[in-house]
Amino acid sequence: MSLARSTALLDEKNTLTSSVTDKYRLAGKITQTCLQHIIQTVLTQYETYTVGEMCRMGDEFLERATTAVYKSVAEKGIAQPVRIEKQEFVGGVSPENGDKFQGGMLAPGDLVKISLGVYIDGYTAQVTQTEVVRHVPNTSAGETEQPLTGSPADAVCASYLASEAVIAYLAQVTDPNPGKAVGVVTGTKIRELVEKIAAAYHVKIVPGSSVRRIRRFLAGQHDIVLERDYKGVLWEVEGEEERALHAVKLAESEAKQESTEGAVCLYEQHIEEEENFTVEAGEAYQVDIQMAAAPQKGAIRLYDFQGYDESGTVINQYGRDFSVTYGLKIQASRKLLSQLEATTSVYPFKLSHVESNVAKARLGLGEILAHQILVPIPVKVAKFVPLAALYEFSKNSKARARDEASKAVPVARNSSSVLLTNDACLRLTGGQAFPPPYVHSAFELPEDVTNLLKLVGHKHGAKVKDVLPGDVDMAPAKEAKMEE
């Protein structure tokens, strides 16, 4: 097939027709419904269930719900297995039954990120919502609910408001008076907006945060799936460290009254080129913002979690790299690969979604991983690295000293899928059904960001319409039904 023909087919499949929009909408509805029930479980039964048990409850619901709809569509299912990540955990926490690490028990004061996603015929809706686990006050004894405060609260506010502000900004392309309020909507301005809010709340943007266009089967699956004509803003570990160090070196030169002419941050040049794109009506976007409670100067790095006793953890999420082929030699590996080809797509998955006997499936995993047919998705934690440690590392490359200086920090995250139709922004996930938790920050939004948020819902401006959760029981004993 020619490049021109394949591009035309890609564009055709991603046109927001009524049929495509309906599939996106249903994926959003299932995702929203599952999220609603998991939040309720997290906040009211955190002493009863482990993180792993709650993740598996959510996965069971998603499997039933997607099986029950669009019976003629083969490509449907879980786009993101349910993850429940507390405090500094930022990825990969979705334990299998029997794993030593079950994500722990939640406790009052924990920041909890709940992530999940669904796809219908390749059209994807994903969500992350941050909640705060609370001690239920004894009202008869005069106790009242108190907000979370301090830097964790700042991170919650910044994450929530940045995601809302970006969605409000994206929605302007659907305004009947385009360009009147904010001008052309670009990737460069998206970055500026998020970074302005992070600075206002004295927090750090966590690497991996992104605002990117999504298309059929292309929803940011850990960069496993190569994408032509990519549009997106991405915060990367090395890049953010380079920017922080560049600022230090500029300050040193200025203090010494040395010329800074020609002092260029290569990463700044890179993002200026990569993010010089225009957002247009007819596109879909995933807005995924993470903020860390780290008010000091420095940067956030992501580390593989090795268990509380440093004995390591079992990876339980994987992605398929379809660009890799290899003639497997071991029978157990060939059998597992055959099962993968029959049951998985381009999205992350758990072995229990492929083979009920996870221990048996893991017997064939080694050879598949060795030849990179599958890409493991490890459990990750976020740590703050002080600027002084980064600076020393830049001079002597001693990673151990840098890592020993790092400190785990709580992270808040908000992620939503949106469709930019010709007359409104259709918010598939998140939105008014999921308000932020009860927190209090001493900081405030800049006035221009507040004004941007006010544009949404204005009678003469852009409209944001939410897909709401359905009324579905998650209990396995009952038949889950959802309208197509």
UniProtKB/Swiss-Prot annotation:
* EC class of the enzyme, as a word: hydrolase
Q: Which organism is it from?
A: Yarrowia lipolytica (strain CLIB 122 / E 150)
Q: Name one GO cellular component term.
A: nucleoplasm
Q: Which UniProt keywords apply?
A: Cytoplasm, Hydrolase, Metal-binding, Metalloprotease, Nucleus, Protease
**PANTHER family on file:** METALLOPROTEASE ARX1-RELATED (PTHR10804:SF102), PROTEASE FAMILY M24 METHIONYL AMINOPEPTIDASE, AMINOPEPTIDASE P (PTHR10804)
Question: What role is this protein assigned?
Answer: Probable metalloprotease involved in proper assembly of pre-ribosomal particles during the biogenesis of the 60S ribosomal subunit. Accompanies the pre-60S particles to the cytoplasm.
Which EC numbers characterise this protein's activity in its record? 3.-.-.-
The Swiss-Prot or TrEMBL record describes its family as follows: Belongs to the peptidase M24 family.
Under the subunit heading, UniProt states: Component of the nucleoplasmic and cytoplasmic pre-60S ribosomal particles.
- Localization in the cell: Cytoplasm; Nucleus
* One record GO biological process: ribosomal large subunit export from nucleus
Record-given protein name: Probable metalloprotease ARX1
One GO MF term on file is: metal ion binding
